[in-house]
Amino acid sequence: MRNPNRTANKRRAENEENVRPDTLIVANSRYGSSNQYTQWLIDRLGADAMSYNKQQLGYTSLYRNIIWVGAIRDAVISNVHMLWQNHHNFGLDGKKIIICGVGIGDPENPDYFNKVMARSGCGPEFCSRYILPGRIDQSRLRLIDRPQFDKFLIDSKRIYGEETHLLVNERAADNYNGVDARALEPVIQEILATRY
């Protein structure tokens, strides 16, 4: 991911750009789906981006729009709580904040959506919220992550209910890949609307 302070400034200088982008994307990815969505957002919006790092979250204060793209783990968008805990310190009140969770559940299922957002602490007064289709390839799981993923597949019934439990187990067995640039269109349009 691009460092918003160093790499992005160098890129703008090389392209003779004088204006700092208005949007920062914070990507929290372990296996690449969130990074793929982030790259598509960079390409479409000319945004800066950084990988999640607790010590560098203060960079969010430099931008008008913040897009958080993180994996959904046990119905929680990874590390988004750090943004909520520090939003006053970073001066994020009044800024456009978009939260995107990436997971293997059905983004169109309201029950799945509501459970993820409730557990992630994303209040509607705070931000726009989206769930993007992710992917799973169990052969790529690191050895340390396998027991946690197996536990998730069992616990998904308790966390999400029967319908989502059956779906995520089926998708896990099939090595589901739903990552799709078209899923970002509402996010892109929401940012573009702030530029008119």
What positions do the PLM features span?
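N-terminal beta1-alpha1-beta2 submodule of the flavodoxin-like/Rossmannoid cofactor-binding fold
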Residues: 1-93, 185, 189-196
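FMN-binding flavodoxin-like domain, especially the glycine-rich phosphate-binding loop
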Residues: 9, 16, 48, 74-196
